[in-house]
């Protein structure tokens, strides 16, 4: 596996290194020892899956506050997605900076998003599926989020937003983030 830090410090690409033959390929998807070696300690507490029926669907931006802040490793298993991480740590030099990357089912690329970052995505194709590993169990009392269209963050979604949950439209604007 190849680990590369992105332009947003703390967020990393994890590229699988498939071993291919006439049957297809084999690749490690997760390795605790390698994560430790890379300085990215991560214990899997939960694994989530999502199906996004229509292109343009947006989910997020979600995170959990301390002491339940969570890191995620995101993989697109079908279709393609514009995956976004936003730094929500108020004391960070990159506070409210965001990174958007395309993940596809064929890329063998994962995205590591550390604790202290909000996560969201837009499906770029119909029937897009994601699988993500999460370092903390869901804690309803620690749940928080940013609006996907918050002008202070300024995310440029590649497609028109065709669907978003009511809950995700009701997150406070950045001025309400603590």
Outline where the language-model segments fall.
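Conserved metal-binding segment of the jelly-roll/cupin
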Residues: 103-125
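Non-catalytic, conserved peripheral segments adjacent to functional cores
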Residues: 1-106, 127, 132-178
């Amino acid at each position: 596996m190849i680990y590369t830090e992105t332009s947003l410090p703390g967020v990393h690409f994890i590229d699988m290194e498939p071993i291919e033959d006439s049957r297809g390929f084999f690749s490690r998807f997760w390795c605790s020892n390698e994560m430790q070696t890379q300085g990215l300690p991560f214990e899997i507490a939960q694994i989530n899956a999502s199906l996004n029926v229509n292109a343009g669907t947006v989910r997020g931006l979600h995170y959990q506050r301390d002491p339940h802040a969570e890191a995620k490793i995101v993989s697109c298993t079908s279709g393609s997605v514009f995956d976004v991480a936003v730094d929500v740590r108020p004391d960070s030099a990159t506070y409210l900076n965001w990174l958007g990357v395309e993940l596809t089912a064929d890329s063998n690329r994962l995205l590591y998003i550390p604790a202290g970052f909000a996560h969201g995505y837009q499906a770029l194709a119909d029937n897009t599926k994601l699988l993500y590993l999460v370092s903390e169990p869901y804690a309803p009392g620690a749940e928080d989020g940013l609006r996907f269209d918050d002008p202070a963050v300024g995310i440029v979604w590649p497609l028109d937003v065709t669907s978003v949950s009511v809950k995700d439209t009701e997150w406070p604007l950045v001025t309400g983030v603590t």
